[in-house]
Amino acid sequence: MKPLLILASASPFRRALLSNAGLAFEARAAAIDERALEQPLEASGASPADVALALAEAKAKDVARYFSDALVIGSDQTMSLGTRVYHKPRDMTEAAEHLRSLSGRMHSLNSAIVLVRNDEVVWRHVSTANMTVRPLSDGFIDRHLAKVGEKALTSVGAYQLEGEGIQLFERIEGDYFTILGLPMLPLLSKLRELGAIDA
């Protein structure tokens, strides 16, 4: 008998990725304070990839408490440029600042997945994509943000690659699903290995 799959996320993007792949699953958002977990990790010098893994694990373990024997998928994504770690912008002014700081530079997206069953970690994975933003004028940034509106506040980089955000980039190195925040190919491979989906 295949285990119940639970996605520990409220993200419509992550839900859509699993649905589009034909997976039968339930979704439940984790009730954790991400910033409270991130701050001590970042202060201790944890890498952005390690922070993403820790948050993915915390989300999965929080949700796993409610589903005995289910396989819970926790995920998180961090973004960094040099030593600076970015968070979702609080407002449009901060979104514009984020885009100005990314202009003409390469940043990294670290997407982590942790599978948990009965409070035990079954599997951890992190994938990284390197994203080079083309040089952006202040005028372009302002027009772009006016066009996309509050969607800019829903992602860590203030952009959605699957939409008009693609116009910000000159080069992308890495898996598309890593950029979207859920590395699907390694996840599907592991779920097949665990007998959770049809092989």
From Swiss-Prot:
Belongs to the Maf family. YceF subfamily. The active site is at residue 76. Disulfide bonds: none annotated. GO terms for cellular component: cytoplasm. It comes from Rhizobium meliloti (strain 1021) (Ensifer meliloti). Its EC number is 3.6.1.-. Keywords: Cytoplasm, Hydrolase, Nucleotide metabolism. Its main location: cytoplasm. It catalyses: N(7)-methyl-GTP + H2O = N(7)-methyl-GMP + diphosphate + H(+). This is 7-methyl-GTP pyrophosphatase.
